[in-house]
């Protein structure tokens, strides 16, 4: 018998198909297509293909998600809302085109008077006020005024005007927006868990994250109003973050100065000098766009990381409180931060299965067939699965007779029906 098992195992281990041999030609040499590419090159090429496919997949996913959100929003609109949305889109496009045309005309109008206005303090003050007031949402033109400042006053003097008005204007806009939007902020804090999470992350990594937000290519005045809705951000912290990123404001001032040089001395400059000035403008714009895009990506990643840390801390606190059967206490002394943490705590309780009530803590009332209560007493507190010395154990007493009825806490005997 063991020999039969051994022979059977050997037979099963043999392959029924002939072994694959390397393809050869009639003279015994290997065919040309038999030679494979080196392993390292194949791995690197496959890795690059996977990365490109992953990037393409991410881009397509974002496009699909955005289009689906737009379609869903459009379907939820009624007739008049759709008309309003179409008119708003047309108006936005017209305003954008008009703004571009107006911006181009501004520098044509400034060319004859730029040299005269360069040393005029009144022009300096008026332009400073313009930069200050466009800090309030929904006004636009902040970047244009920065370029105009560089066009009229040069790089450094224009940057000084632009930076000082930006810091003070953004801080004032922040304070005013927070005052006006205070009720809206509290409603948003209590209902929107994403808003609450970002508000909580700004409390501990506020200055660094605010600087990253200020470096992002976001609409200036709208950004001032949006950040003001986060109650954990202090106005002075926001002003300090704006002051820290003021070197970024050298870009529009430098572009404005180069435009003036090209407009005034373009006829006298050689082709090489013109090319250098034009290339410097293009390179400066490209650096600004790339830096803004990179900072935007890093800002989103940092915000997600901080949100995960805050959620983990809140989750551990909830689990510890539930394990110890103690009520949840305030997460922070700051009331605004505590509101945000409470909103996240509710979301975490839903995720991990905790609720504000315990399904076992229910009061039971047993009635007989006539609808009369047969339990002579009811406890004021919730029901607990535990026995006292005055209560009887239903499993100890057995099934009992047909005339006996048991509640979970009290053994009640009924007289048999007559």
Curated annotation (Swiss-Prot):
Membrane topology field: Multi-pass membrane protein
Chain intervals for the UniProt region annotation (VTT domain): 150-259
InterPro entries per UniProt: Golgi_membrane_TVP38/TMEM64, VTT_dom
Source organism, top-level taxon: Eukaryota
Segments on the Lumenal side according to the record's topology features: 1-82, 143-158, 257-274
Gene Ontology CC entries for this record: Golgi membrane
Compartments in which it is found: Golgi apparatus membrane
Side Cytoplasmic, residues: 104-121, 182-235, 296-418
Keywords assigned by UniProt, alphabetized: Glycoprotein, Golgi apparatus, Membrane, Transmembrane, Transmembrane helix
Residue ranges, annotated region (Disordered): 1-51, 368-418
Transmembrane segments: 83-103, 122-142, 159-181, 236-256, 275-295
UniProt entry tagged with the keyword Amino-acid biosynthesis: no
Biological process (GO), any one: vesicle-mediated transport
Comp. bias (Basic and acidic residues): 40-51, 369-399
Residue positions the entry lists as glycosylated: 65
Low complexity compositional bias, start-end: 1-25
Pfam family, one: VTT_dom
Domain notes for this protein: The VTT domain was previously called the SNARE-assoc domain. As there is no evidence that this domain associates with SNARE proteins, it was renamed as VMP1, TMEM41, and TVP38 (VTT) domain.
Function: Golgi membrane protein involved in vesicular trafficking and spindle migration.
Similarity comment: Belongs to the TVP38/TMEM64 family.
Protein name: Golgi apparatus membrane protein tvp38
The species this protein was found in: Aspergillus terreus (strain NIH 2624 / FGSC A1156)
Lineage: Eukaryota, Fungi, Dikarya, Ascomycota, Pezizomycotina
Name of encoding gene: tvp38
């Amino acid at each position: 018998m063991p020999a039969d098992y051994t022979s059977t195992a050997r037979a099963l281990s043999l392959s029924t198909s002939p072994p694959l041999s390397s393809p050869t030609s009639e003279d015994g040499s290997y065919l040309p297509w038999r030679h494979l590419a080196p392993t390292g090159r194949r791995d690197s090429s496959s890795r690059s293909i996977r990365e490109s496919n992953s990037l393409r997949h991410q881009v397509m996913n974002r496009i699909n998600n955005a289009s689906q959100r737009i379609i869903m929003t459009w379907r939820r609109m009624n007739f008049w809302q759709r008309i309003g949305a179409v008119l708003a889109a047309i108006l936005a496009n017209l305003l954008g085109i008009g703004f571009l045309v107006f911006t181009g005309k501004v520098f044509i109008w400034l060319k004859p008077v730029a040299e005269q206005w360069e040393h005029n303090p009144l022009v300096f003050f008026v332009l400073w006020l313009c930069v200050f007031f466009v800090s309030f949402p929904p006004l636009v033109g902040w970047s244009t005024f920065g370029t105009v400042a560089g066009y009229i006053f040069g790089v450094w003097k224009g940057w000084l005007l632009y930076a000082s008005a930006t810091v003070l204007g953004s801080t004032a806009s922040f304070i005013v927006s927070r005052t006006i939007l205070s009720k809206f902020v509290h409603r948003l804090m209590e209902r929107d868990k994403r808003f609450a999470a970002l508000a909580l992350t700004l409390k501990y990594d506020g200055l660094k994250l605010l600087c990253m937000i200020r470096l992002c290519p976001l609409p200036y005045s709208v950004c001032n109003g949006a950040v003001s809705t986060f109650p954990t951000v202090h106005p002075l912290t926001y002003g300090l973050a704006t002051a820290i990123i003021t070197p970024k404001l050298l870009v529009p001032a430098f572009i404005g100065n180069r435009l003036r040089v090209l407009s005034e001395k373009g006829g006298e400059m050689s082709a090489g000098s013109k090319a250098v000035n034009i290339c410097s403008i293009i390179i400066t714009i490209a650096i600004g766009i790339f830096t803004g895009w990179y900072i935007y990506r890093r800002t989103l990643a940092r915000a997600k990381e901080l949100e995960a840390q805050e959620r983990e801390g809140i989750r551990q606190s909830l689990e510890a409180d539930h394990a110890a059967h103690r009520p949840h206490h305030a997460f922070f002394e700051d009331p605004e931060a505590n509101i945000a943490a409470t909103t996240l705590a509710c979301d975490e309780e839903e995720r991990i299965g905790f609720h504000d009530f315990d399904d076992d803590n229910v009061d039971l009332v047993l009635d007989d067939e006539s609808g009369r209560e047969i339990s002579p007493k009811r406890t004021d507190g919730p029901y607990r699965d535990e026995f006292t010395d005055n209560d009887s154990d239903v499993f100890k007493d057995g099934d009992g007779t047909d005339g006996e009825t048991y509640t979970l806490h009290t053994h009640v005997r009924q007289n048999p029906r007559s």
